[in-house]
Every structure is written in structure tokens, then in C-alpha cells.
A protein has these predicted regions:
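A generic structural signal for well-ordered coil/turn residues at beta-strand boundaries
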Residues: 59, 75, 95, 114-120, ...
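Active-site pocket scaffolds in enzymes
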Residues: 280-350
Length: 350
């Protein structure tokens, strides 16, 4: 607002003093989680920030840069949106349990829960089903709360007990319960029927003429489902529909469902995990479809990382998860904005 006093820079001693307890909590959580992974026999890895492809999801946007080779020629590179591609290459190399506190980057993201640069905690277990990674998430979140001494997470008037047994809820069950939509009836042969979901969503969300099945799904999820999740305790939302599989494998006994889950606390998404897809040709097909949609919507598309696709074909069966570390620290420390828990928040913070 005009006339509002500008916020002091983060290095202002008075502002830093206010933020310091949250930053100390960040250190405590980091140490506690490294201890958990050490107990479990994980190896901590550090993978490259600069990538040939930052990821191939339609709605994720990555900062782009150039590198100059010794001969003066230039090559495009991207700041990664996730360490996933690099970590899976390490699984193909023979690593079996790895984790990384990864600095990642996303354009077009800023707010109470979003930063353009943030920390993603990712870990992978070779030879493990995805419910093993779900169980890891529950322990990791409890360890974070234990490290700071907080008994209850709180955000925007919602609370969650990080030590309670989590709620397990299928995506189809959530759509039926919170939106009155029979989601699986709108999927056939692994493909979403746009007309069927649009009809089911009438009166529940606004559907635009150019909305895809995935767009309508996301609107219902955001407006009707997510606000109800993680209330009183954690919610694990699992069995995502196959059109939203991303890098997850589809269930062998039901092609409408993918081995994908998300974890919520206080309505906040904390983690997104997969039973990992190891079919390189299927992964290529999904990437190409996503990039075609990205080109249509945003006028840009990212290249495919052919080295990654080769590694997918060589990967063992595995499961993995990406957890928003800054969000976890925010809840575990009692902070109300994500910038309170990062040491050097963006200079444009207001």
C-alpha cells in the first residue's frame, strides 16, 4: 500500500534477531534428519544444480542460463527444479539409499509458501515399495517436530499433531467425500475423459473451454480437497489417478491408478512421492506429452535429458520422495511465512 513503511532488509540486526529462533530451528531439524538417514544407512549426495533439462512437468518453470565452453561456444543450461534426474542416475549407477538437501529453483513462484529458490529434501530407496517411503515421511516429520520441541503444527487457523497416526486417504475417496465426484469413472485405459470430468465438476469449479482433464482435476483438488487435508493429524493422499502419474509407475492391477502420494499438514502440501517408473519409453511418452502442452500454454518447452532416459532404463525398482524442507521447518518452528526460515530470503520480500 502507498505510504507503508518498507520492510527492513534481512540483514538488519533487528529483523535478524526476530528471525534467528526460526533459523536455529532450521539447524536443529537439519541435524535431526541427517541423523535419521544415517541410522537408516543412507548416503548423502550432492548433485549438480546446472542441468540440460530442469524437469519436464507442464506447469513448472525454471530459470535458464548459458555456459561458455573453453572454445568460446555457448550451451543452454537450466537451474534444476528438482534433483530427481541426477539422483535417479545415481540409482542406476548402483547406489541403493541416497538423500540430498538440494537447492532448487522455480520461476513464477512467490508467496507465504513459495520461494524462487528453496531447499528440497529428496530421498530414494532401491528395492522398496512406495509405502516404505510413506512410512519414512511420517518419521521424518515427527523427528523435525521433536527437534524443535513443538507439539502441534499450526498454519492459517489449522492444526495438526505431527506425532499422531496419519490419515490415509485415496485420491478417489477424497474426491467422492469432499466434492461428490466419482473420479475413477472419468478415466479409461489410463487416459482421462475430459468431458466426463467436466460434467461431474459442474457447479463445483469453473471449467474453461480450453481446460484439460488435468486442469479440472487440479481445480477440484485445490478448491475442495486440499483445504480439508492434514487437519488434526497428517494426511497421506495416495493412489493418484494415472493421468497425474508424472514419474510414477501405474499399478499393475488397475491402470487408472498410479503409485503416487502426497503428504499434507494443516492443508499444506509437504511431500510428493512415487513408486518410480523404470520404463524409459513410457517416461519419454509422458515427457513429450507434457512438453507439447507446455508449448501450447506458455510458448516454451524444455529439452529431454536423453542421459536421464537411458538411466531410467537401467534403474532398479525404487521409490522416492521430494519434501519441501523449508515448509517443514516453517511448521516445526511455528513460523508463519516461509521467508522466516531461510537465512537469506529474496531481496524483494515485502
Amino acid at each position: 500500500m502507498a505510504g507503508d513503511k518498507p520492510m527492513s532488509p534481512f540483514w538488519s540486526p533487528s529483523r535478524h534477531l526476530d528471525r534467528r529462533p526460526f533459523l536455529q530451528a532450521r539447524g536443529a531439524v537439519t541435524g535431526a534428519l541427517r541423523g535419521f538417514f544415517a541410522e537408516q544407512g543412507f548416503v548423502e549426495v550432492e548433485t549438480s544444480v546446472l542441468q540440460v533439462s530442469p524437469g519436464n512437468e507442464t506447469h513448472l518453470h525454471a530459470p535458464r542460463t548459458e555456459i561458455m565452453r573453453p572454445d568460446g561456444s555457448r550451451a543452454s543450461r537450466y537451474l534444476r527444479t528438482s534433483p530427481e534426474f541426477a539422483c535417479k542416475k545415481l540409482l542406476a549407477a548402483g547406489e541403493t539409499r541416497i538423500f540430498e538437501f538440494a537447492r532448487v529453483f522455480r520461476d513464477r513462484e512467490r508467496g507465504e509458501l513459495h520461494l524462487p529458490e528453496f531447499t528440497m529434501l529428496e530421498w530414494y530407496r532401491a528395492g522398496a515399495p512406495y509405502d516404505a517411503i510413506m512410512a519414512d515421511c511420517v518419521v521424518v516429520i515427527a523427528r523435525a517436530a521433536q527437534a524443535t520441541g513443538i507439539g502441534t503444527f499450526s498454519f492459517r487457523g489449522r492444526t495438526a499433531d505431527p506425532f499422531a497416526e496419519p490419515e490415509l486417504l485415496t485420491v478417489a475417496g477424497a474426491f467422492e467425500h469432499f466434492a461428490g465426484i466419482d473420479l475413477l469413472s472419468t478415466i479409461s485405459g489410463g487416459e482421462g475423459n475430459r468431458a466426463a470430468l467436466a460434467a461431474a465438476a459442474v457447479g463445483k469449479v469453473r471449467v474453461a473451454e480450453d481446460d484439460t482433464w488435468s486442469d479440472i482435476f487440479s481445480k477440484v483438488l485445490v478448491e475442495h480437497v486440499e483445504p480439508q487435508l492434514g487437519q488434526g493429524r497428517l494426511t497421506i493422499l495416495f493412489e493418484y489417478p494415472s493421468p497425474e502419474a508424472a514419474l510414477a509407475r501405474v499399478k499393475t492391477d488397475d491402470p487408472r491408478i498410479a503409485e503416487r502420494f502426497e503428504v499434507y499438514a494443516c492443508g499444506v502440501e509437504l511431500a510428493n512421492g512415487f513408486g518410480e517408473l523404470t520404463d524409459a519409453e513410457e517416461q519419454r511418452k509422458r515427457f513429450m506429452e507434457s512438453m507439447a502442452e507446455k508449448q501450447r500454454r506458455y510458448g516454451e518447452a524444455y529439452p529431454l535429458d536423453e542421459d536421464f532416459l537411458a538411466a531410467v532404463a537401467a534403474m532398479p525398482e525404487a521409490s522416492g520422495v521430494a519434501l519441501g524442507f523449508d515448509r517443514l521447518v516453517m511448521l516445526a518452528s511455528g513460523a508463519i511465512r516461509i521467508d522466516q526460515v531461510v537465512w537469506t530470503p529474496p531481496a524483494d520480500e515485502r
